[in-house]
From Swiss-Prot:
GO terms for cellular component: cytosol. This is Bifunctional glutamine synthetase adenylyltransferase/adenylyl-removing enzyme. GO terms for molecular function: [glutamate-ammonia-ligase] adenylyltransferase activity; [glutamine synthetase]-adenylyl-L-tyrosine phosphorylase activity; ATP binding; magnesium ion binding. It is an enzyme of class 2 (transferase). The lineage of its organism: Bacteria, Pseudomonadati, Pseudomonadota, Gammaproteobacteria, Enterobacterales. It comes from the Bacteria.
């Protein structure tokens, strides 16, 4: 234990003079001297009750002793016969335990988290014991309150604020709300009361027992102002009245207060669960709620003004960077996202802060700085209050109390303590300002030129001049003014509430200022106003853009770069949430992490809620697609990587859809019984075309076929038994349904299953044996070409190995070169006649001569032609690696393979970028002439010449 500092050693002599004879100096331990020097509250308490000091010396406080509070208190109350006796015992018990907590805290015998837990549990124990004693007494006097069925009705107490969060201060008010379940009357009393009367009277007595000062002090100051209608409302409300209030009139700040609400005492009963379930939707919205930001900022502004008005300087709770700002930071995430992230629904601050870090909503460094600052500030606050059991958060001005705090906080002196304190509070303030901003500093609103507001507010005509647009060309200036005017007219057709109008009026000057600084102002503004028209009636999205300037900047740059992204954001405003974090926005998920991220994402949705599952799949896909496109636009992903990401994303979606369909089918029919003898599900999904070849684009559909290995005689083992092969057919149908169902978030993917054996006329799902037989005996050459770009994208190892073997066997069949050349060339000519360019003087990048499809046909032809001699050619299903294999196996010269690869990736890159611009896949006839000549020459060499 650290020895007392010099000023405190001097003060000890003053303490000694106050001590009574039984507490002679020589009989005291060094620990006792330290605590008595630090805390006047402990000093006064042990002078009045010397036996408490003896107990402390012989039985020092333990971290887990809060578990005994209830039994200790019951023992103290066992002989209480009247309310006066109850009040006395409650006060003495509270004081005795608070002395023990102060002792443990001063000497740092337990952690600060443990101190907060002990303080909160002590309050809960005292409240519940007082309530239960009074309930019995009131029932004896007035009868037992019952509902219409004659069931006894309890009084439930919601502990709010720090009490609810398990984070009570040393000297603190307690904020409570009283409720009872159902209406009815008392039974068994001398006269009948309705339940409202009974619980109101009981509530009044409970407040008096806890709050009224006596010669023994008080238990806690009770604050009931958080209840519905505050001081003007009923003291106690029924569940029905509570529900009506919060649904109809609950205000933002009441939501914030309710985050920490906790039912005191036994919280596992039927009524407790009912109350919790009733309040949860009010507190945690299912949608992301950005209105929180402005409300919290307004509250913070009110507090800051109060600090100034009351001269609350050096206030570690309410000042800049203080405890309240940490609480606000945590609550922002809870209230914005808590409805969708169960881990954010904790009442306690520190677990919620850990969840925020785990969800990457704050950086680990920021979260750790907040955690350390919070524990530092809470220890300082509790030590400060324990000096005199006084409710204060203002740092002392006198030398003695400064010396006390410096010593207890383990600093050499006061300047050293305040230096560390200042650093902690600066860290908190930085995070707070980055997240919530601060009305007290010069805001964007104040610094923004009045002229931008005029541009938005005044209905300017196309011919009007305005200085802020002087840098634009005349055409662009007219276009911008016309777009603003058209947007304002569009707004008049929509129902926008006063809050939405207020947010829009705040947002638009900032948006116009940023957009009009660009050279492409008119084009960008046209895309953004189209998006805004779709969200103006949904204030939460306007608030997102208004509250997060960085999100607005990302929106502008992405919409400027890509109308496809602008369209996606307009159709699915939920994606605006992705703009908040540039670290993830321009950094797509690692290619091997899509499955895992999707699995975690779906854990938030009930497994049996198909509608929510479908929405979640689509929302995940769109968010990931946006991130890939943003990285593509930013130039951080080359074309090959864009396709890799799009392909891995699609595979993750296939995995999740099959899993969902499987669970639904097994629940209905049971599993096919042949699976009892083997691992896996006996099912595979094969990807063809762009999916099989790792070459997906932004709007590619999925070419899929479904395989199973179910024997003819297999049956399912569920109550509704069906044929095993029928099970797999229904599974495949279910998968198609899950992909194609249109929800508010659109469809998942267009799926084309026509490449299956016998095409659209064939069975949707095929047995592995039938697939092999078809490929060997019935398939056309073009179907073998398609097999070159096929691979299993979902399936158990057995079926995957079987498919790979069939594919390899078919591709390595000996083929007569001339016949194959003719068949491949004629198929290409048919395609060109059917799908070729219908636009004069334009080059269709994919379908025209010298385009992407020609390269694909060249590689497919060469694999089918030479794989019999060089089986290694069957290894890959994508064109780039096939071209590498052709060079490595001396079929194509390396220079030609590299040139074709460059041409192929260049053309695909252009297709990606045209898709981002929502443009068709054709360009001017004079584009890519070198690449086209190269491909034509290669085509001539391999597929025309003898």
């Amino acid at each position: 234990m650290k020895p007392l500092s010099s000023p405190l050693q001097q003060y000890w002599q003053t303490v000694v003079e106050r001590l009574p004879e039984p507490l002679a100096e020589e009989s005291l331990s060094a620990q006792a001297k330290s605590v008595l020097t630090f805390s006047d509250f402990v000093q006064d308490s042990v002078i009045a009750h010397p036996e408490w000091l003896t107990e402390l010396e012989s039985q020092p406080p333990q971290a887990d002793e809060w578990q005994h509070y209830a039994s200790w208190l019951q023992e103290a109350l066992s002989n209480v016969s009247d309310e006066a006796g109850l009040m006395r015992e409650l006060r003495l018990f509270r004081r005795r335990i608070m002395v023990r907590i102060a002792w443990a805290q001063t000497l740092a015998l337990v952690t600060e988290e443990s101190i907060l837990q002990q303080l909160s549990h002590l309050a809960e124990t005292l409240i519940v014991a007082a309530r239960d004693w009074l309930y019995d007494a009131c029932c004896r006097e007035w009868g037992t309150p019952c509902n219409a069925q004659g069931e006894a009705q309890p009084l439930l107490i919601l502990g709010m604020g720090k009490l609810g969060g398990g984070e009570l201060n040393f000297s603190s008010d307690i904020d409570l709300i009283f409720a009872w379940p159902e209406h009815g009357c008392t039974q068994g009393g001398r006269r009948e009361l309705d339940n409202a009367q009974f619980f109101t009277r009981m509530g009044q007595r409970l407040i008096k027992v806890l709050d009224q000062p006596t010669q023994d002090g008080f238990v806690y100051r009770v604050d009931m102002r958080l209840r519905p209608f505050g001081e003007s409302g009923p003291l106690v409300l029924s569940f029905a009245a509570l529900e009506d209030y919060y649904q109809e009139q609950g205000r933002d700040w009441e939501r914030y207060a309710m985050v920490k609400a906790r039912i005191m005492g036994d919280s596992d009963g039927v009524y407790a669960n009912e109350l919790r379930a009733m309040l949860r939707p009010f507190v945690f919205r299912r949608y992301i709620d950005f209105s929180v930001i402005q409300s919290l900022r307004n509250m913070k502004g009110m507090i800051a003004r109060e600090v100034r008005r009351r001269g609350l300087t050096d206030n570690i709770k309410l000042g800049a960077g203080g405890i309240r700002e940490i609480e606000f930071i945590v609550q922002v995430f809870q209230l914005i996202r808590g409805g969708r992230e169960p881990s954010l629904q904790s009442r306690a601050l520190l677990p919620t802060l850990s969840a925020i870090a785990a969800l990457h909503l704050l950086s680990e460094n920021d979260a750790e700085q907040l955690r350390v600052a919070y524990l530092f500030l809470r220890r300082l606050e509790n030590l400060l209050q324990s000096i005199n059991d006084e409710q204060t958060q203002t740092l002392p001005f006198d030398e003695l109390n400064r010396a006390r705090l410096a010593w207890a906080m383990d600093f050499a002196d006061w300047p050293q303590l305040t230096g560390v304190l200042t650093a902690h509070m600066a860290n908190v303030r930085r995070v707070f300002n980055e997240l919530i901003g601060d009305d007290e500093s010069e805001t964007q609103e104040e610094s923004l030129s009045e002229q931008w507001r005029e541009l938005w507010q005044d209905a300017l005509q196309e011919d009007d001049t305005t200085p802020v647009l002087a840098h634009l060309s005349e055409d662009d200036r007219k276009q911008v003014l016309m777009l603003i005017a058209d947007f304002r007219k569009e707004l008049d057709k929509r129902t926008i509430g006063p809050r939405g109008r207020q947010v829009l009026d705040h947002l638009m000057p900032h948006l116009l200022s940023d957009v009009c600084a660009r050279e492409d102002a008119a084009v960008t503004l046209s895309r953004i106003t189209a998006l805004l028209v779709g969200i103006v009636t949904r204030t939460t999205y306007l608030e997102l853009l208004s509250e997060f300037p960085a999100a607005l900047k990302h929106l502008i740059s992405l919409c400027a770069a890509s109308p496809m992204i602008a369209s996606q954001l307009a159709r699915y405003p939920l994606l605006l949430d992705e703009l908040l974090d540039p670290n993830t926005l321009y950094q797509p998920t690692a290619t091997d992490a899509y499955r895992d991220e999707l699995r975690q994402y779906l854990l938030r949705v009930p497994e049996d809620d198909e509608e929510q599952q479908l929405e979640a799949l689509r929302q995940f896909k769109q968010a990931q697609l946006l991130r890939i496109a943003a990285a593509d636009i930013a130039g951080t992903l080359p074309v090959m990587k864009v396709s890799d990401h799009l392909t891995w994303l699609a595979e993750a979606m296939i995995d999740a859809v099959v899993q969902q369909a499987w669970v639904q089918m097994v629940a209905r029919y049971g599993k096919p019984n042949h699976l009892n003898e083997r691992e896996g599900r006996g099912f595979a999904v094969v990807g063809y075309g762009k999916l099989g070849g790792w070459e997906l684009g932004y709007s590619s559909d999925l070419d899929l076929i479904f395989l199973h290995d179910c024997p003819m005689d297999a049956m399912t083992d569920g109550e509704r038994e069906i044929d095993g092969r029928q099970f797999y057919l229904r599974l495949a149908q279910r998968i198609m349904h899950l992909f194609s169902t249109r929800t508010s978030s659109g469809i998942l993917y267009e799926v084309d299953a026509r490449l299956r054996p016998s095409g659209a006329a064939g069975m949707l799902v095929t047995s592995a044996e039938a697939f092999a037989d078809y490929q060997k005996n019935e398939a056309w050459t073009w179907e073998h070409q398609a097999l070159v770009r096929a691979r299993v994208v979902y399936g158990d190892p057995q079926l995957t190995a079987h498919f790979d073997a069939v594919r390899r066997e078919i591709m390595t069949l000996p083929r007569e070169g001339k016949t194959l050349q003719t068949e491949v060339r004629e198929m290409r000519e048919k395609m060109r006649a059917h799908l070729g360019n219908k636009h004069r003087d334009r080059f269709d990048i994919k379908a025209d001569e010298g385009g992407i499809t020609d390269i694909e046909f060249i590689t497919q032809y060469l694999v089918l032609r030479y794989a019999h001699e060089k089986p290694k050619l069957t290894r890959w299903s994508d064109n780039v690696r096939i071209l590498e294999l052709l060079a490595q196996n001396d079929i194509m010269e390396e220079q030609e393979a590299m040139a074709l690869t460059r041409a192929y990736t260049t053309l695909r890159d252009e297709l990606h970028h045209l898709a981002l611009q929502e443009l068709p896949g054709h360009v001017s006839e004079d584009c890519f002439t070198a690449e086209r000549e190269l491909v034509r020459a290669s085509w001539q060499k391999w597929l025309v010449e003898e």
